From Swiss-Prot:
The keyword Cytoplasm applies. Keywords: Cytoplasm, Methylation, Protein biosynthesis. It comes from the Bacteria. It is found in: Cytoplasm. This is Peptide chain release factor 1. The keyword S-adenosyl-L-methionine does not apply. Methylated by PrmC. Methylation increases the termination efficiency of RF1. One of its GO terms (molecular function) is translation release factor activity, codon specific. One of its GO terms (cellular component) is cytoplasm. The gene is prfA. It holds the Pfam family PCRF.
């Protein structure tokens, strides 16, 4: 293992000892804020340090076995050869585990998200496909026990959506969906196509982590134009009698967000402000992410909205993710919510990128 990684592990071991002492300190115990913060850090550091101690024990076993290779007894030497082989294999596995545990964690992985799906080229067929994508993510959310809440929708004339915005709430939503941002292309024969010709349409997907209070960008109220209007969304007759829907324009950036699904104007405004904050955060971080991706030539993770990331080919029942050259002939299962079949290889590729960077 590289000296730089061993140094990191030594620092973590020292920190673990500090945390153990701090969590037993009466002054810390009486301060619940500090106690919770130290407890969270302890929970993160403890498994890494435990594995590092195991690595040290196995390293000691290897040195002992190597010493026995010089024993005058041939039986002992034969046993030592086998033990050296086994302990070396153990060391390789433990080092790989430790490297994965040392990978930098994305602080947004545990967050809820704003999911934006927009029809692109292809007219009505693109809008219908937007509906298919939204249904796919909704079913995936059901499988994972997440909650999906539509904030804004603009339905297509023949079904689907010209645009649909939703908030997805649950455990590690961003960590799972963060590589879904980009252009999704569909190839199929539209129902209105009498000649049976395959048409190509596209939709764009954006996945934005919902910021917490510490992350939220401070927005000057003078930079906002707030419009109210009558909602055309869900909620029955009541919503059409009051101007409960909210549209907020951030004048410096030109970003517009709107929320129309709640009956309460106050709730719609709160959701819209949270979404605006997420979009402003995304604007800041996207440029940095693109620069890093370009510099390191990452296959996954640039998050460029215009990048074609996936093709759904209906005649062949095929899904292809172009970033990792993944092709699956299980289109129906993926669209039914089995998105993990695509997401897991992407996450594995991203982890491989990180491991390569860790070793640089």
């Amino acid at each position: 293992m590289k000296a730089s990684l061993l140094n990191k592990l030594d620092v973590l071991s020292d920190r673990f000892e500090e945390l153990t002492a701090l969590l037993g300190d009466a002054e810390v115990i009486s301060d619940q804020t500090r106690f919770r913060a130290y407890s969270r850090e302890y929970a993160e550091v403890e498994p890494v340090v435990a594995l590092y101690k195991q690595l040290a024990r196995v390293q000691g076993d290897l040195e002992g076995a190597q010493a026995l290779l010089k024993d005058s007894d041939p039986d002992m030497r034969e046993m030592a050869v086998e033990e050296v082989r086994e302990t070396k294999q153990q060391l390789v596995e433990l080092e790989a585990q430790l490297q994965r545990m040392l990978l930098p964690k994305d602080p947004n992985d545990g967050r809820n998200v704003f999911l934006e799906i927009r029809a692109g080229t292809g007219g009505d067929e693109a809008a219908i496909f937007s509906g298919d994508l939204f249904r796919m993510y909704s079913r995936y959310a059901e499988r994972r026990g997440w909650r999906v809440e539509i904030l804004s929708e603009n339905e297509g004339e023949h079904g689907g959506y010209k645009e649909v915005i939703a908030r997805v709430e649950g455990d590690s939503v961003y960590g799972k969906l963060k590589f879904e941002s980009g252009a999704h292309r569909v190839q199929r024969v539209p129902k209105t196509e009498s000649q049976g010709r395959i048409h190509t349409s596209a939709c764009t997907v954006a996945v934005l982590p919902e910021p917490d209070e510490q992350q939220a960008i401070e927005i000057n109220p003078a930079d906002l134009r707030v419009d109210t209007y009558r909602s055309s969304g869900a909620g029955g007759q009541h919503v059409n009698k009051t101007d409960s829907a909210i549209r907020i324009t951030h004048l410096p950036s030109g970003i517009v967000v709107e929320c129309q699904e709640e009956r309460s104007q106050h709730k719609n405004r709160a959701r819209a402000m949270s979404w605006l904050s997420a979009k402003l955060n995304d604007q800041q971080t996207s440029a940095a992410a693109s620069a890093i991706a370009s510099e390191r030539k990452l296959l996954v993770g640039s998050g460029d909205r215009s990048e074609r990331i996936r093709t759904y080919n209906f005649p062949q029942g095929r899904v292809t993710d172009h970033r990792v050259n993944l092709t699956l002939y299980s289109l129906d299962e993926v669209l039914a919510g089995g998105v993990d079949a695509v997401i897991e290889p992407l996450l594995a590729e991203y982890q491989a990128d990180q491991l390569a960077a860790l070793g640089e």
